[in-house]
Amino acid sequence: MILIKNAKILTPKGIVEGNLKVEGKKISEIGGKAVKSDVVIDGSRKAVIPGFFNTHTHAAMTLFRSYADDMQLHEWLEKKIWPLEAKLDDKAVYWGTKLACVEMLKSGTVFFNDMYFFPEAIARAAEECGIRACVSAAFFDFFNPDLLELNLKNAVKSLREIEKYDVLRAIGPHAVYTVSLDGLRRAAEIAEEMDIFMHFHLAETEKEVLDFKKQHGKLIVQALDEIGFLSKRLIAAHSVWLEDAEIEILAKKGVSVAHCPASNMKLCVGKAIRYEAMKRAGVNFTLATDGAASNNNLDMLEEMKFAALLQKFHHSNPTLLKAEEVFEAATLNGAKAFGIKSGVIKEGYEADIVLVDLAKPYMQPEHSLIANLVYAASSGCVDTVIVKGEVVVEGGVFRSEEEELKIIEKANEVAKRLTGSA
């Protein structure tokens, strides 16, 4: 049992000052008396908040952080990223993912939804680090029927291999410009048969949308709906260049959208996601960082601020995407997307908890905790992180300094090998 004493607890009904008790993997009591516990955490001058759910990542791309920046998207991919990715192996992905897990946990993220190569290495790294994850078996067919059969077979094989790990699973058909409509239809059938999620890039750029419409004579979401691709299993990353009719379809089918504001701005996708239209339609709107090669960090505190400011600036309206809304997108909505009873501090919910240090200068004065978290905070305020009832970060340190330093060292060795600078 874990007892957090004398904290400011952010609940759905407001801030409760007092104690919080964790039994097993659940929050068992809020505001009760202090009792003898296995672990006692002093919550003085700290706030208890729900952990963040990062709903679209390529975790091992931490290895490419700041390797290639300030470039056009296609040039960036073709000249810098893809040549390095061709050299990846399971060891590289394992250490790159571990580095990402440490970074995410230390900035308050308790869950990430990943799409990358070598899913077994990703699942193993996540489980060892004690973070929640949904691991995708990425799938491409490049419009080649033979490649479709081969790569689908390999994806299913990978999904079966990671079943032994304590992670959720997804099939990850990459995008409409790398996977045929038949491949997308087959991926949806596999997700249904295996009772797993789907992870997909949708309408990230105008070029993607225009090329698809020229080829198929219809909007992407309409075509996806016709082949049975859309459901509550689907997490659609980006979803920037969508029309009203498409947004309505996504809402009707229960699709969750993963908004990646920092990556969208850095890679210049051309406009801001249509948050207000999604809100009106009832789309489950979540938040994500994308990969560290295009962000360049995995800090959800920073991502909340980017999301809110992008809407305000793009639409010249300071009232859009309020602090409370973006905080919910980063926590509760992400948990909802994956059917996890988490994302809020509430009795009976999963103990995915972050303690933030209110003594930091940028967390004062305390007019509004949520506004401070969204507009003022940095990852430096994260003191303690609990995932599934287990303490994984304490005093701002991931488990032990020795383990953290080893992960950083190994990831650097791999990065140097990949770039030829070893």
Curated annotation (Swiss-Prot):
Record bears the keyword ATP-binding: no
UniProt keyword list: Hydrolase, Metal-binding, Zinc
Residue numbers binding Zn(2+): H56, H58, H201, D290
Keyword match GTP-binding: no
UniProt-listed InterPro entries: Amidohydro-rel, Deaminase_MtaD/DadD, Metal-dep_hydrolase_composite, Metal_Hydrolase, MTA/SAH_deaminase
Cofactors required: Zn(2+)
Enzyme class: hydrolase
Catalytic activity: S-adenosyl-L-homocysteine + H2O + H(+) = S-inosyl-L-homocysteine + NH4(+); S-methyl-5'-thioadenosine + H2O + H(+) = S-methyl-5'-thioinosine + NH4(+)
A Pfam family matched in the record: Amidohydro_1
Signal peptide: none
EC number(s) on file: 3.5.4.28, 3.5.4.31
The protein's role, per its UniProt record: Catalyzes the deamination of 5-methylthioadenosine and S-adenosyl-L-homocysteine into 5-methylthioinosine and S-inosyl-L-homocysteine, respectively. Is also able to deaminate adenosine.
Protein name: 5-methylthioadenosine/S-adenosylhomocysteine deaminase 1
Source organism of the structure: Archaeoglobus fulgidus (strain ATCC 49558 / DSM 4304 / JCM 9628 / NBRC 100126 / VC-16)
